[in-house]
């Protein structure tokens, strides 16, 4: 099988690494890819926003299957255009990708189909949103409706913080993503990420993970795209997974189909496990970044036939087998992230991978043959262990061998699970 992978982040490096191991693979291309992905795939300098160019390349190379990694091309309808050209594609349609592309769309779906989630209101102007906040009080959550690279959500612990977040959205801090705002109830509990495939009819539960959104140790500082993750998430017991499937995922699949937007691809449900049970915080319509890295480390099965079955409506014919081990990833980011940071800082050394640990590339590039950091989140150091404690020790041991002066990381990834393991 000839496969084209769209994307250039740590998530796509993990997908490329896993897809390349498949005995079914004849050729793997990645557009645009990164220097880490180049170890597993032929890099193609395609502009993925130019759908006609992507289709032309796929036809020229007789590509059998396209896997779309990031959310932006999905929300832009790349999967629709590829499928219309007769090319099997992993990833939802533009209409179904609204589950991630619009927070309000998802909340309205939850309201229609009785999916547990926090109470909410949608606003297109600042003043009514502020009136609502004053009436509700804090803590309260303010979300830019559209795609904001994981940074459009403010969990406001005070009313003043909530009002400032509303101003940020309507003053253009998140571009067009903030032209509408969702204000929702603060949910108290433990967060978890749940991943599940759907071909529009069948659902296949994958695995659970826990992400670390805030930039600083002890979950302090501003939100980021994610500073690290581990899998499995202990809070997601088999009973909780079953409830999540029954109360959240299955009604979403049937609801989307009923509304004329059948969903094919991966559901990444951001959940809050409250006293009542699982409640939906948000949906993403692609593998998490950095959660994908820990999922791929734990997946025993060949990934390629599972993705292909999702794309071709035959998900009921495949299964996914997982290692019992835990996996943990630590994000190395550029100093200053998620604010302003220096670009093109040199990365002097990346340590060799072992059976237990490896480094995935995210925001890296080659400049004059030398590896440099081009993004905010740059490397993902990922390791296995019998438990999270062991996986964490291995990940930090490898992370400390990376030679990059402008990099930093959180030192406490996995702290909640480790506290549980010690107890």
UniProtKB/Swiss-Prot annotation:
Main enzyme class: ligase
GO BP terms, alphabetized: 'de novo' IMP biosynthetic process; purine nucleobase biosynthetic process
Pathway noted in the entry: Purine metabolism; IMP biosynthesis via de novo pathway; N(1)-(5-phospho-D-ribosyl)glycinamide from 5-phospho-alpha-D-ribose 1-diphosphate: step 2/2
Keyword flag Ligase: yes
Keyword Manganese in record: yes
Domain ATP-grasp: 107-312
E.C. number: 6.3.4.13
Enzymatic reactions: 5-phospho-beta-D-ribosylamine + glycine + ATP = N(1)-(5-phospho-beta-D-ribosyl)glycinamide + ADP + phosphate + H(+)
Annotated residues for binding of Mg(2+): 282, 284
Record key words, sorted: ATP-binding, Ligase, Magnesium, Manganese, Metal-binding, Nucleotide-binding, Purine biosynthesis
Cofactor field: Mg(2+); Mn(2+)
Cofactor note: Binds 1 Mg(2+) or Mn(2+) ion per subunit.
Signal sequence bounds: none
Record-listed ATP binding positions: 133-193
Similarity-based family: Belongs to the GARS family.
Name the UniProt record assigns to this protein: Phosphoribosylamine--glycine ligase
Organism: Agrobacterium fabrum (strain C58 / ATCC 33970) (Agrobacterium tumefaciens (strain C58))
Lineage, highest ranks first: Bacteria, Pseudomonadati, Pseudomonadota, Alphaproteobacteria, Hyphomicrobiales
């Amino acid at each position: 099988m000839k496969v084209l992978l769209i994307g250039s982040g740590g998530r796509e490096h993990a997908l490329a690494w896993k897809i390349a191991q498949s005995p079914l693979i004849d050729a793997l291309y990645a557009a645009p890819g990164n220097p880490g992905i180049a170890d597993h795939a032929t890099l193609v300098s395609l502009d993925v926003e130019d759908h006609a160019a992507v289709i032309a390349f796929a036809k020229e190379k007789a590509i059998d299957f396209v896997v779309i990694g990031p959310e932006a091309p999905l929300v832009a309808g790349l999967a629709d255009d590829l499928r219309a050209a007769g090319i099997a594609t992993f990833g939802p349609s533009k209409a179904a990708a609204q589950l991630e592309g619009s927070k309000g769309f998802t909340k309205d779906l939850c309201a229609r189909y009785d999916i547990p989630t926090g109470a909410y209101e949608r606003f297109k102007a600042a003043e009514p949103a502020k009136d609502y906040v004053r009436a509700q009080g804090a803590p309260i959550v303010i979300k830019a409706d559209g795609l904001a690279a994981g940074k459009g959500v403010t969990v406001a612990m005070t009313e003043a913080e909530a009002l400032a977040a509303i101003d940020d959205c309507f003053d253009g801090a998140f571009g067009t993503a903030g032209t509408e705002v969702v204000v929702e109830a603060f949910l108290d509990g433990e967060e978890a990420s749940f991943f599940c495939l759907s071909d529009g009819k069948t659902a296949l539960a994958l695995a659970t993970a826990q992400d670390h959104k805030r930039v600083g140790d002890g979950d302090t500082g501003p939100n980021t795209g994610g500073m690290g993750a581990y899998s499995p998430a202990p809070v997601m017991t088999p009973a909780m997974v079953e409830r999540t499937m029954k109360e959240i995922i299955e009604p979403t699949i049937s609801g989307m189909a009923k509304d004329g937007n059948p969903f094919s691809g991966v559901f990444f449900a951001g959940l809050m496990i409250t006293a009542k049970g699982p409640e939906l915080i948000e949906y993403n319509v692609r593998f998490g970044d950095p959660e994908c890295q820990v999922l791929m480390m734990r997946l025993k099965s060949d990934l390629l036939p599972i993705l292909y079955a999702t794309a071709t409506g035959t998900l009921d014919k495949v299964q996914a087998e997982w290692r019992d081990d835990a996996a943990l990833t630590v994000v190395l980011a550029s100093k200053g992230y998620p604010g302003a940071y220096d670009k093109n800082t040199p990365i002097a050394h990346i340590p060799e991978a072992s059976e237990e640990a490896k480094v995935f590339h995210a925001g890296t590039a080659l400049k004059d043959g030398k590896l440099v950091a081009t993004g905010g989140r740059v490397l993902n150091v990922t390791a296995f262990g019998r438990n999270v404690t062991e996986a964490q020790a291995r990940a930090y041991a490898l992370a400390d061998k990376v030679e990059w002066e402008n990099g930093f990381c959180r030192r406490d990834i996995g702290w909640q699970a480790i506290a549980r393991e010690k107890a």
